[in-house]
């Protein structure tokens, strides 16, 4: 192989390595973002459940008042 071919091969390999490195960085960022969204989703689900329980309690009290009155 000539020196020129080896240089071209080295450039292609370096380009591939750079691309893989960038993709790994992007993957790490997306994983972190995904984890953050999972935590936010769980928080919102808990909040939603709390509101549902409050609403059920209020509706139960209203039903109780209607049946007594």
Swiss-Prot record:
GO biological process: division septum assembly; FtsZ-dependent cytokinesis
Coiled coil: 6-68
Subcellular location: Cytoplasm
Alphabetic keyword roster: Cell cycle, Cell division, Coiled coil, Cytoplasm, Septation
Matches recorded under InterPro entries: Cell_div_ZapB
A cellular component annotation (GO) from this entry: cytoplasm
Function description: Non-essential, abundant cell division factor that is required for proper Z-ring formation. It is recruited early to the divisome by direct interaction with FtsZ, stimulating Z-ring assembly and thereby promoting cell division earlier in the cell cycle. Its recruitment to the Z-ring requires functional FtsA or ZipA.
Family per similarity comment: Belongs to the ZapB family.
Oligomeric form and interacting partners: Homodimer. The ends of the coiled-coil dimer bind to each other, forming polymers. Interacts with FtsZ.
Stated name of the protein: Cell division protein ZapB
């Amino acid at each position: 192989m000539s020196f020129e071919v080896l240089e071209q091969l080295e450039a292609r390999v370096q380009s591939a390595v750079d691309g893989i490195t960038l993709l790994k960085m992007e993957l790490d960022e997306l994983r972190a973002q995904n984890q953050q969204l999972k935590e936010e989703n769980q928080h919102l689900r808990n909040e939603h459940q709390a509101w549902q329980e409050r609403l059920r309690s209020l509706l139960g009290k209203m039903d109780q008042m209607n049946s007594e009155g």
